[in-house]
Amino acid sequence: MAPQERLLIRGGRVVNDDFSQVADVLVEDGVVRALGRDLLPPGDTSRGLRILDAAGKLVLPGGIDTHTHMQFPFMGSQSVDDFHQGTKAALAGGTTMIIDFAIPQKGSSLIEAFETWRNWADPKVCCDYSLHVAVTWWSDKVKEEMKTLAQDKGVNSFKMFMAYKDLYMVQDQQMYAAFSQCKEIGAIAQVHAENGDLIAEGAKKMLALGITGPEGHELCRPEAVEAEATLRAITIASAVNCPLYIVHVMSKSAAKVIADAKREGKVVYGEPIAAGLGTDGTQYWNKEWRHAAHHVMGPPLRPDPSTPGFLMNLLANGDLTTTGSDNCTFNTCQKALGKDDFTKIPNGVNGVEDRMSVIWEKGVHSGKMDENRFVAVTSTNAAKIFNLYPKKGRIAVGSDADIVIWDPEATRTISAKTHHQAVNFNIFEGMVCHGVPLVTISRGRVVYEAGVFDVTAGHGKFIPRQPFAEFIYKRVKQRDQTCTPIPVKRAPYKGEVITLKPRETKEDDTAGTRMQGHS
């Protein structure tokens, strides 16, 4: 694929997170070279310049999907959107970068998992990508590998699971240790916030009651299970003074916990996803098993139909910060592994292609947020948190030319029949969305235009991320300087100190226990 060296995007409304302006955008060698009015006279196509007319359209920074799982081996199967198909679909939806997860098994090397995911992705990706790395166990080796990943491999985010007991779940003391190391190396800690112990017990209870269908998935993981874990994670992170990022915020209860924590000054960020913003958990009670199973994911969609609107309100007002898709797709025949037991249904839904349109429809078209906030929650905030800004997440001189020409008035109807993902269903089936990407530009190349791709596997590149992102660590460093407890200066105690007698007999122990119980 020959390089496309020069583009002029003419006459569009350039939208960044902080302001909008009508301007031309000149792109050369994969970056934005100039931004302003009437950069070149009409008809100047010299030296290979291609002019794209964006009059009446919006020119947006390419979307950054903070949460994907391409070709992920999980629950006995593997997600069907691989790094090629999944990233092509992302481009069709206006997303020009994804951040996927390298997830080692317990006892396995984090660095080896990272290299495995790199080997899967590098030859296939059609857009730029980066990797979070999961911490699924704890040891001195894990601690050292986190440091190596942050310093040498371009990883500045590590995810801990509070769910998936006996698979990925870590205990509180392990989470405290991992959070402490994140702070030491300048990374941001991420958590999947659900109480894994309660989920395990709840699943047993549902199956004992004869509830084997997809509704059992939500019934054993109610909102309280998500909210409790969210509060616990925030409490642990606050004790460490470590910045925290809550992935896939799915419930009103968990979102309220995050909003309250932000009002208390905690450095915490919440990530709702396209699924939770675009549909709800009433789907689990659908009479058709396959329809219900298609929506199974963890944490589950919530049956309260007001949840998507509530999450969008908090996303619009700043209580929630970014958006991902948690794209982890399994075909119906894979979901059918759990046809007689909901605990065996592979968890995951689509969203990488439809995230931008769903958020525009439910957020901007509904009047909840403006175009600038849309750019913030789909691109810029992620770039700032994960230390990609201003190369990503902004249209400015020197920024990467990851750009979308967006038609806010056009509509499209989402359907599995027309989407570009490998999965054979779509949880947003039939949704009419205002807001359609007309042209997607990745690394300075037009890779998608009017429904046609011009991109090959390997076009995208791995983007390393440096630690100590200023957007989050400025506050953390200042708090270390000003909020560290100090001892009270006082004169030493010089009075009498009693002598404790050693307990030598079982009777002494019993007596001591009785005395303590009546003190």
UniProtKB/Swiss-Prot annotation:
Entry note: cofactor: Binds 2 Zn(2+) ions per subunit.
Gene3D superfamilies linked: Metal-dependent hydrolases, Urease, subunit C, domain 1
N6-succinyllysine PTM sites in chain numbering: K256
Binding site for Zn(2+) 1: H67, H69, K159, D326
Binding site for Zn(2+) 2: K159, H192, H248
SUPFAM superfamilies the record matches: Composite domain of metallo-dependent hydrolases, Metallo-dependent hydrolases
Family: Belongs to the metallo-dependent hydrolases superfamily. Hydantoinase/dihydropyrimidinase family.
Oligomeric and partner information: Homotetramer.
Protein name in the entry: Dihydropyrimidinase
Origin organism lineage: Eukaryota, Metazoa, Chordata, Craniata, Vertebrata
